A protein has these predicted regions:
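Secondary-structure end/capping motifs
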Residues: 146-229
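Short, glycine-/small- and polar/acidic-enriched structural segments
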Residues: 1-83, 92-95, 99-105, 120-122, ...
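Pocket-lining segment of extracytoplasmic ligand-binding domains
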Residues: 7, 85-182
């Protein structure tokens, strides 16, 4: 969206959607089984990079639930910090930075294992309540590459759809076993917990179709964050031909 709005002619075009909600979680320093967003009032939370979707989604959720983002914690404002790089947020939190942080899996599970943090809420579930589904993760390529490699992209999308269909029926243990070669520092039980969490929040798409409704939800979040001057044209940055063909032909 950013590159498209800059006027670059060879901008990226989305052709398949992978996840339909934010995959991050709010992490506290202690177990909080009765956590609500009100618990963030007057607190610091590590939110990620300015202009990034994780931060924008978190701030959108807070605003839509009546919280005020700012640095006046005595007045109950939530101080969403953007000064800690995304890749070191968990380590910074373990080192004492912030009262809360956000984390994706498997980082959240690792923090619980190390007792440096405890997952208390899903940003994805909270954002779905106020914005609906959003195209959080999608596959894209440049206009030129797409025009020259339609067969390759179609075969890739077909394979993705097969994987999505398999994930619908596979058990958490089966999915975790398939993931394990890529996460060899995590136990199978930890990976099962990761899969369970993402199943519970319904994060994964059942098919690769990238809808206009979901793009509009993301655009609203970006506009609320002040990061978007104009909305992109859906048909310019999304091509659904590959997804539709995959859904028609892959059995």
């Amino acid at each position: 969206i950013y590159v498209y709005n800059q006027g670059n002619e060879n901008y990226a075009v989305n052709f398949a959607q992978l996840t339909k909600t934010d995959g991050s979680f709010i992490v506290a320093r202690e177990e909080m089984p009765n956590f609500t967003l009100e618990d963030l009032k007057g607190k610091d939370i590590l939110g990620g990079r300015k202009g990034g979707v994780p931060l924008m989604t978190l701030e959108y959720v807070l605003k839509k639930n009546g919280l005020t983002i700012g640095t006046n914690k005595e007045a109950g404002e939530v101080n969403v910090r953007t000064d800690v790089q995304f890749g070191v947020m968990a380590g910074a939190f373990a080192g004492g930075e912030g009262d809360f942080t956000t984390a994706f899996e498997p980082t959240g599970t690792q923090m619980e294992e190390e007792k440096t943090g405890y997952i208390v809420a899903s940003v994805g579930e909270l954002s779905r309540e106020v914005a609906g589904d959003i195209p959080y993760t999608a596959y894209s390529t440049t206009k030129e590459f797409m025009a020259d490699n339609e067969d390759l992209i179609q075969r890739f999308t077909n394979a993705l759809y097969k994987g999505q269909q398999w994930c619908k029926t596979a058990s958490s243990e089966e999915i975790a076993q398939a993931m394990q070669p890529f996460f060899n520092d995590l136990s199978l039980n930890d990976l099962i917990s990761v899969v369970d969490r993402y199943k519970e929040v319904d994060a994964w798409c059942d098919n690769p179709l990238f809808t206009e409704e979901s793009l509009n939800a993301l655009v609203e979040i970006m506009e609320e964050a002040g990061e978007l001057d104009k909305a992109p044209v859906y048909n310019d940055i999304v091509n659904t031909d590959f997804a539709n063909k995959a859904m028609e032909n892959v059995k």
